[in-house]
């Protein structure tokens, strides 16, 4: 299985209007910086405190780049709607060209069965609090809202009457959307959900001139995985010693590959420590099974235990 060459010329991003959810931290911020450096008009839509987000945007803008920050809680439809409006208004052509859905929340440990057993013996009189579904609210509902709004605003006609140009929707799932994970339930459920959204939506987006691709990163050393690192450390395990990370650079390159490659549509890209691979998540290639087996074999040989 050969890694893809995801090196692309980012010159095609100049003047393009971009919205990145989760754009003020982690992979989202790294991607946004690369795209802004290439001349794109980038809106960072993030739940980071307004002062922090605006400082990031200001620092980048002082370098001659075009960066806009808007506070955005992706679980709120109204908040996302305002973020998308902000991105369109920030664009010189009053339009939107690329959306990448990097906003996400950390892996919530615990299988559903574990949580049910923790609730104690069943009783009709028990006061049962609702389970924590934040992973699903942020990682799936949030992505669905972003995808919906992207497809809506992509259809705006440019204010200067020019051609709309290429449109790219980049859905961010995880390799956790492709493998069993008995140690958790809500996180893989959310990431499998994004995969399902991708597989249904890609069949139609091309009808309205939108390319749709998916990113499925392996673990990347960002603040988002801090809870997992801490949980492993509490068990006496140093995460970096038993788990090879995918690189931030490979994630940014894969996102950029999706953003500017006008021939790329309907592909799911696994970002691994060894590089980026087309999972071939389609009926012709066994819904990624043939690609996933060697990937997971390498991870288990490297010490990963799902």
Swiss-Prot record:
Q: What is the protein's quaternary organization?
A: Homodimer.
Q: What is its EC number?
A: 1.1.1.352
User: What is this protein identified as?
Assistant: 5'-hydroxyaverantin dehydrogenase
**What does the similarity note say?**
Belongs to the short-chain dehydrogenases/reductases (SDR) family.
Q: Which UniProt keywords apply?
A: Cytoplasm, NADP, Oxidoreductase
Organism source for this protein?
Dothistroma septosporum (strain NZE10 / CBS 128990)
What the record says about the induction of its expression is: Expression is positively regulated by the dothistromin-specific transcription factors aflR and aflJ.
Q: Which reaction does it catalyse?
A: (1'S,5'S)-5'-hydroxyaverantin + NAD(+) = (S)-5'-oxoaverantin + NADH + H(+); (1'S,5'R)-5'-hydroxyaverantin + NAD(+) = (S)-5'-oxoaverantin + NADH + 2 H(+)
Q: What does this protein do?
A: 5'-hydroxyaverantin dehydrogenase; part of the fragmented gene cluster that mediates the biosynthesis of dothistromin (DOTH), a polyketide toxin very similar in structure to the aflatoxin precursor, versicolorin B. The first step of the pathway is the conversion of acetate to norsolorinic acid (NOR) and requires the fatty acid synthase subunits hexA and hexB, as well as the polyketide synthase pksA. PksA combines a hexanoyl starter unit and 7 malonyl-CoA extender units to synthesize the precursor NOR.
Q: Which PROSITE patterns match?
A: ADH_SHORT
GO molecular function terms attached to this record: 5'-hydroxyaverantin dehydrogenase activity
Q: In which pathway does it act?
A: Mycotoxin biosynthesis
Q: Which Gene3D superfamilies match?
A: NAD(P)-binding Rossmann-like Domain
The entry's cellular-component GO terms read:
cytosol
Q: Where in the cell is it found?
A: Cytoplasm, Cytosol
Where's it mainly located? cytoplasm
Annotated binding of NADP(+), by residue: 25, 27, 48, 52, 73, 187, 191, 220, 222
- This protein's source sits in the domain of life called Eukaryota
Q: Where is the active site?
A: 173 (proton donor), 187 (proton acceptor), 191 (lowers pka of active site tyr)
**Stretches assigned to coiled coil:** none
């Amino acid at each position: 299985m050969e890694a893809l060459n995801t090196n692309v010329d980012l010159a095609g991003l100049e003047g393009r209007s971009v919205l990145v959810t989760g754009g003020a931290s982690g992979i989202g911020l790294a991607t946004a910086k690369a795209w802004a450096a290439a001349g794109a008009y980038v809106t960072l839509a993030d739940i980071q405190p307004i002062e922090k987000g605006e400082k990031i945007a200001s620092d980048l803008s002082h370098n001659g780049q075009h960066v806009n920050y808007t506070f955005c809680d992706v679980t709120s439809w109204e908040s996302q709607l305002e973020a998308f409006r902000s991105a369109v208004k920030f664009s010189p052509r009053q339009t939107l060209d690329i959306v990448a859905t990097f906003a996400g929340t950390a892996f919530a440990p615990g299988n559903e069965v574990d949580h049910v057993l923790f609730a104690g013996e069943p009783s009709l009189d028990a006061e049962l609090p609702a389970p924590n579904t934040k992973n699903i609210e942020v990682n799936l509902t949030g992505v669905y809202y972003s995808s919906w709004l992207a497809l809506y605003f992509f259809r705006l006609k440019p204010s200067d009457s020019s051609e709309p140009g290429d449109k790219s929707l980049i859905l961010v799932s995880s390799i956790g959307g492709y493998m069993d994970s008995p140690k958790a339930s809500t996180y893989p459920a959310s990431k499998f959900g994004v995969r399902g959204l991708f597989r249904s939506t890609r069949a139609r987006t091309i009808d309205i001139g939108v390319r749709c691709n998916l990113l499925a990163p392996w673990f990347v050393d960002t603040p988002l995985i801090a809870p997992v690192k801490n949980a492993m450390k509490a068990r006496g395990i140093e995460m970096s010693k038993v788990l090879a990370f995918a690189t931030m650079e490979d994630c940014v390159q894969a996102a950029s590959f999706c953003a500017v490659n006008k021939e790329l549509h309907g592909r799911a890209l696994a970002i691994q420590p060894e590089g980026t691979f087309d999972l071939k998540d389609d009926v012709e290639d066994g819904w990624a099974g043939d690609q996933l087996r060697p990937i997971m074999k390498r991870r288990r040989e490297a010490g990963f235990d799902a």
